[in-house]
């Protein structure tokens, strides 16, 4: 009798679970009624390092799941090429543009130009000044990354070490890391920077 009661409870739970499952969100009208595939341009101002490879692969994979056609463009740190890619995406009337690693002073104007053309824009680690309505702006917490890694270095070497810094100026995440790094140098004067090296490739 106990087995039958347990089986009925289990069956009851299993049959009620579909009713508790979250119903999928409705597809936005703009997407559902779109003529042809939705075209997204992913434009990144870095080379094809491991991080970029993962970033681009993730964008393509997610786009595919949504039925989007995703095109990717890498400018290898060449600001003129990056701007050209963005302008081409605007003139080719992409439905959406994802920008990564755009720099000052040009990124804000490019984002506004795309929005004015009716293109949805999302930016990651891109220098955008002020709020632009409808634009999604995201960035990683570079100060925390710096504090964690530098803090571990200070702990491992009792606050005394000679280091080589890998850094490239001008990219928003690198600039945020540099600001945190300068503060940490004041706290740990016995950690000496012997050299700073880095290039975008």
Language-model segments: residues:
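Bacterial N-terminal signal peptides that target proteins for export
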Residues: 1-8
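Bacterial N-terminal signal peptides
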Residues: 8-16
């Amino acid at each position: 009798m106990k087995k039958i009661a347990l089986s009925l409870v289990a069956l009851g739970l299993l049959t009620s679970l579909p009713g508790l499952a979250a119903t999928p969100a409705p597809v936005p009208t703009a997407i559902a009624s779109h003529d042809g595939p939705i075209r997204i341009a992913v434009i990144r101002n870095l080379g094809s390092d491991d991080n970029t490879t993962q970033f681009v692969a993730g964008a393509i994979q997610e786009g595919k799941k949504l039925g989007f056609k995703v095109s990717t463009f890498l400018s290898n740190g060449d600001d003129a090429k990056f701007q050209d890619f963005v302008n081409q995406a605007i003139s080719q009337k992409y439905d959406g543009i994802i920008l990564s690693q755009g720099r000052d002073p040009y990124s804000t104007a490019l984002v506004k130009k795309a929005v004015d053309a009716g293109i949805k824009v999302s930016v990651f680690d891109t220098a955008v000044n002020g709020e632009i309505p409808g634009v999604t702006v995201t960035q990683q917490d570079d100060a925390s990354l710096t504090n964690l890694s530098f803090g571990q270095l200070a702990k491992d070497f009792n606050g005394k070490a000679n280091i080589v810094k890998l850094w490239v100026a001008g990219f928003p995440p690198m600039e945020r890391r540099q600001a945190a790094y300068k503060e940490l140098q004041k706290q740990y004067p016995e950690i000496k920077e012997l050299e700073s090296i880095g290039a975008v490739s």
